[in-house]
């Protein structure tokens, strides 16, 4: 079966936003206008088609990024486009989901609330989009809300996100009088009835007289932005010649794809205004797979190569999300970059070098599914029946087992102990946690060796709450949850040299390993957080024992030296040693390295310290409670970074240790009579003050 829609008519986009900016509603409307869903699902009725897990509908937030396919006609050429939408969660505990979806997107729509503007989570999502080089357009939503201000959001995008927004529309009216928008390219007004019903089209009218000045100012900025895309257009602009509509669109698209500008549109998804022009902007300014940089990959030997987006050539696809579906079992969401993925064929998981059979292939529409035979380059779909593939793995042909870029996943910052309520739950809990950990690489499960308890770790309290909740609903496992524990780390402050000789002689074959190590701190937050150098000259330690020395140090780091927390940011250099022809073994060198490493780090000269996760906390509070909020931040060992005004509300940004933030939402509520809100995000690890460090050690070491 040949491809229905050529590659240049495909758009893979994400809709990313801060929680409550109206992202799911916007996606819903897009699906409605593109003819996929017939009844509009409202989030606050808990019926949105994109949010299909029970917990999401209850909490009114989006957790899993479902991938949905819909169609829209290009406003210029009228050709049908295939738009694949990845719905990304806006809550900070789910940034891992956003990272994942950014990885497979070609473009994104950043949704901002016209009242709330740029929030801390928006900054994180924006940084991730920059990191993966994703061009985007901005949609300012909720223009009908009290306090709506399109131009404020434009200023915040410039100041807080350091971006270059270029409005291609300006709003007509605001708050309850928001009626539509002026298209600055066609220079026409699009107006809607105030109570526009779903699916209602806008009327095209002349620009209202009271907006002429604003329109002229922003039209000028827009033309200048387009003219800067090339020297010819710049010359034309400077000579005072009008640029044609096609030249403006081409200029803006070129600069949008180069991430030099971000086109801005506005609307109110809930009130059905502005969604069709938003889709037109997606079609005109966001890239097809052929217009973005080809993905980088590596061969099995580790050589870097480029994998071009094309149907020709051997298949190369990336698994970016695993989900357990109640009807079909495990779904692996996959983006094909090259070649064709066909159902019923065998491919190689080149990351693990294991063969996999592609069972069924599905295209997902929010919560219905369509079975297909092939998935072509640039397309996104779900594979049923993969056994060994997890997030971030590459599926490729055996003839050309390329590995596409790997994704980096953040380490968890918080953990809790979970105990099954009954014996019967014990086994089920093991299976459930295993499945959840497969789906979500930022969620880890391990067993505490001393207490034998199962410890789960994740990106925040909400993250773990939702996972425990899913365990109860999807796997019917009842579990008791302990108090949250902070993921402390340990490191050293100074470089030390340490010699260690491990020699045992007790009849028969002895053990002998002898190493000289230099142990140095790396800069805070280094990636990777352990570096090993071998500077052995003249074979004083034979080559085959070097990996054992590295392994000994790496394993010693896991157990820490002060309070048993994993160590980070350390570089070890093996620079001398000796061996014994008969008694030396890998085991002996591993033990020598491990004991030498611990001894070196424990020495007073190394200056070992405990590190704790510091959170960037943003609190929005009415002015009356400002004093209490700041006083409380200081009490929690916080450092207030800034205080701003936003639409009559005070905005406090502070750095506060995670260990002081448990139960904060309840305290903040009672402090402000429920009127203040906050959000927090992990910022960095910092050294713990001495008195706190002693308490931690006392608790851990008894």
Swiss-Prot record:
InterPro entries: EFG_II (IPR041095), EFG_III (IPR009022), EFG_III/V (IPR035647), EFG_IV (IPR047872), EFG_V (IPR035649), EFG_V-like (IPR000640), EFTu-like_2 (IPR004161), G_TR_CS (IPR031157). GO terms for cellular component: cytoplasm. Keywords: Cytoplasm, Elongation factor, GTP-binding, Nucleotide-binding, Protein biosynthesis. It comes from the Bacteria. Pfam families: EFG_C, EFG_III, EFG_IV, GTP_EFTU, GTP_EFTU_D2. GTP binds at residues 17-24, 87-91, 141-144. It is found in: Cytoplasm. Catalyzes the GTP-dependent ribosomal translocation step during translation elongation. During this step, the ribosome changes from the pre-translocational (PRE) to the post-translocational (POST) state as the newly formed A-site-bound peptidyl-tRNA and P-site-bound deacylated tRNA move to the P and E sites, respectively. Catalyzes the coordinated movement of the two tRNA molecules, the mRNA and conformational changes in the ribosome. This is Elongation factor G.
């Amino acid at each position: 079966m040949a491809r229905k829609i050529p590659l240049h008519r495909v758009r893979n986009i994400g809709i990313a936003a801060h929680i409550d900016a109206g992202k799911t509603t916007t996606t819903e409307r897009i699906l409605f206008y593109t003819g996929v869903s017939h009844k509009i699902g409202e989030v606050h009725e808990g019926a949105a088609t994109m949010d299909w897990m029970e917990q999401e509908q209850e909490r009114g937030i989006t957790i899993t990024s479902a991938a949905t396919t819909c169609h829209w006609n290009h406003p210029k050429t009228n050709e049908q486009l295939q738009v694949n939408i990845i719905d990304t969660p806006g809550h900070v505990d789910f940034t891992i989901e956003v990272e994942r979806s950014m990885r497979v997107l070609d473009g994104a729509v950043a949704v901002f609330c016209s009242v709330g503007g740029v929030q801390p989570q928006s900054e994180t999502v924006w940084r991730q989009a920059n990191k993966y080089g994703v061009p985007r357009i901005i949609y300012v939503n909720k223009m009908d809300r009290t306090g709506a201000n399109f131009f404020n959001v434009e200023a915040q995008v410039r100041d807080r996100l350091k971006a270059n927004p270029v409005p291609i529309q300006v709003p007509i009216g605001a708050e309850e009088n928001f009626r539509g928008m002026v298209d600055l390219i066609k220079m026409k007004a699009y107006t809607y009835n105030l109570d526009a019903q779903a699916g209602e089209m806008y009327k095209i009218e002349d620009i209202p007289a009271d907006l002429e000045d604003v329109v002229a100012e922003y039209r000028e900025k827009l033309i200048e932005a387009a003219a800067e895309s090339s020297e010819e257009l710049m010359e034309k602009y400077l000579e005072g010649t009008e640029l044609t509509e096609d030249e403006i669109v081409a200029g803006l698209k070129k600069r949008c794809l180069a991430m030099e500008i971000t086109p801005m549109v506005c609307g109110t998804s809930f009130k059905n205004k502005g969604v069709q022009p938003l889709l037109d902007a997606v079609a005109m300014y966001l890239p097809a797979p052929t217009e973005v940089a080809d993905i980088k990959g590596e061969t099995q030997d580790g050589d870097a190569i480029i994998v071009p987006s094309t149907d020709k050539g051997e298949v190369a696809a990336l698994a970016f999300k695993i989900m357990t579906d109640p009807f079909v079992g495990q779904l692996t969401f996959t983006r094909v970059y090259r070649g064709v993925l066909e159902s019923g064929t065998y491919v190689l998981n080149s990351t693990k070098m294991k063969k996999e059979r592609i069972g069924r292939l599905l295209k997902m529409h929010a919560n219905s599914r369509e079975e297909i035979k092939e998935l072509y380059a640039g397309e996104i779909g779900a594979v049923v029946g993969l056994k060994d593939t997890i997030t971030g793995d590459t599926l490729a042909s055996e003839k050309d087992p390329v590995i596409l870029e790997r994704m980096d996943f953040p380490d968890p910052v918080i953990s809790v102990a979970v105990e099954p309520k009954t014996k019967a739950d014990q086994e089920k809990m093991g299976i459930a946690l295993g499945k959840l950990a497969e789906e979500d690489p930022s969620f880890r499960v391990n067993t505490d060796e001393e207490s034998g308890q199962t410890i789960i770790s994740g990106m925040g309290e909400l993250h773990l709450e939702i996972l425990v909740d899913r365990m109860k609903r999807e796997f019917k496992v009842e579990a008791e949850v302990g108090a949250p524990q902070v993921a402390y780390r340990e490191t050293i402050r100074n470089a030390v040299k340490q010699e260690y000789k491990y020699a045992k002689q007790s009849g028969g074959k002895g053990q002998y390993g002898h190493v000289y190590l230099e142990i140095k701190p790396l800069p805070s937050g280094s990636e990777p957080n352990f570096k090993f150098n071998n500077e052995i000259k003249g074979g004083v330690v034979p080559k085959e024992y070097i990996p054992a020395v590295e392994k000994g140090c790496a394993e010693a780091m896991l157990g820490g030296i002060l309070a048993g927390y994993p160590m980070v940011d350390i570089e070890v250099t093996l620079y001398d040693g000796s061996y014994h022809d008969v008694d030396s073994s890998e085991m002996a060198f591993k033990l020598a390295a491990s004991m030498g490493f611990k001894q070196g780090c424990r020495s007073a000269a190394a200056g070992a310290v405990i590190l704790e996760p510091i959170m960037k906390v943003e609190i929005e509070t009415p002015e009356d409670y400002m004093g209490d909020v700041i006083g409380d931040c200081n009490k929690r060992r916080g450092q207030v970074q800034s205080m701003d005004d936003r639409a009559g509300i005070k905005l406090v940004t502070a750095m506060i240790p995670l260990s002081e933030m448990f139960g904060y939402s309840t305290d903040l509520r009672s402090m402000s009579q429920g009127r203040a809100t906050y959000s927090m995000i992990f910022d960095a690890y910092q050294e713990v003050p001495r008195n706190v460090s002693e308490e931690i050690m006392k608790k851990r070491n008894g």
